[in-house]
Amino acid sequence: MATGWRGEGAQHQGGRPYQEDSWAMRTLGDGSLLAIVCDGMGGHAGGATASKVAVEAFVRAIEQGGALADGLKDANDAVGRTAAGRSELSGMGTTLVAVLVRGDEVRWISVGDSPLYLVASGVLERINEDHSMAPQIDALVKRGMLTEEEAENHPGRHTLREAVMGQPLSLTDKGSRRLGPDVKLLLCSDGVETLREPQIAAAAIRPAAALVEAVLAAGKEYQDNVTVVKLERAR
């Protein structure tokens, strides 16, 4: 019989004056575990509102029996409705990464650059697409047009190609994966990327709060908000 899943989350506003990340986790009636992380943008009021509204709408849709795509649609619609006619929320939006995990399978949907990592045997693998400019910039390194340092510090690296803003979505990533016995899943905001992938993998054996603390310990100036939701098999 397949084991169940358990999860925990932690977050910190880092070196920013406010927190724009939101997250949630729910156990559903069929035993599935739902988790979601949203990283808002659009200033204090806008970013925080967008991520909170998106998380609430997404969770509500899934709890009412909807699929992941229904959750994303409701989240996108809710962000658009909330911003309509409110100048202080103009241009607000959020990333979104959500999973449903049950037994030996994870299903996910995502928009934006918030990573979904799978950790197995100490190796970290990002399994969702990155909808920022980072993949295109990294491709220039492979073509010899930029150095790795230039790519890492490129001013457009974190520019999003897609976000949940109430507009039609042209980029959405979704998929599923069979899971081995000792894997862990990490849903994160991109603030975690202050750490290198081997550092994230090493910290994944510890509680989610320890990974957040490792990010803060790196001492990056103006550290972005960081959120980590860690899922693992219940023992």
Question: Model-predicted segments: where are they?
Answer:
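PP2C/PPM-type serine/threonine phosphatase catalytic domain
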Residues: 1-235
